[in-house]
């Protein structure tokens, strides 16, 4: 029979165990390769390490606070788009979990690292904005802020996965895994990479 000391030792061991996403994927060896996005991809601080991508934080209350949101949770929240999916966080979490398992099987890498690489590669660095009023409107190329790069990357990745899964025998989790792997490689098979290149090409033409 276990003594009180043994129980205390077990509790201490449980407390000292590292936090892993879905109790499988570690945050320790994850790095953000783009120095400009380090502050906007929430993955390296201790507060960003969570077991489940659902912190129930009030990130929309203040400007720029969403940069503090764990990056996997931002991806999860972005899946809850198109009226019929609104508010179905459990469904979105399940999709992300399955997608991460598929990524690990296909690439043998840490899925968190693959997600970060995909976001770094998918964020456009230059865009064209409309300048002028009252009829005379011209496009002008502008640089994109780091936070908007992250926002755009997440939006493009989830949009690509959603469109690929529509009327397709593949599940949304499989399509999300494919999209993330291709985006992490920088492959033009990725919807997000294609859109990013298109945005940058239009901006370059309007310099």
Curated annotation (Swiss-Prot):
Family annotation (InterPro entries): Ribosomal_uS7, Ribosomal_uS7_CS, Ribosomal_uS7_dom, Ribosomal_uS7_dom_sf, Ribosomal_uS7_euk/arc
Highest taxon listed in the record's lineage: Eukaryota
Disruption phenotype: Embryonic lethality when homozygous, due to cell division arrest at early embryonic development stage.
GO cellular component: cytosol; cytosolic ribosome; plant-type cell wall; plant-type vacuole; plasmodesma; small ribosomal subunit
Coiled-coil boundaries: none
SUPFAM superfamilies with a match to the protein in the record: Ribosomal protein S7
Gene Ontology molecular-function annotations: mRNA binding; structural constituent of ribosome
In-chain residues carrying the UniProt-annotated modification N-acetylalanine: 2
Tissue: Expressed in root tips, lateral root primordia, leaf primordia, shoot apical meristem and vasculature of cotyledons.
CDD domains: uS7_Eukaryote
One biological process term in Gene Ontology: translation
UniProt keyword list: Acetylation, Ribonucleoprotein, Ribosomal protein
PANTHER family assigned to the protein according to its UniProt record, in alphabetical order: RIBOSOMAL PROTEIN S7
Record-stated family: Belongs to the universal ribosomal protein uS7 family.
NCBIfam families: PRK04027.1, uS7_euk_arch
Name of the protein this chain belongs to: Small ribosomal subunit protein uS7y
Gene: RPS5B
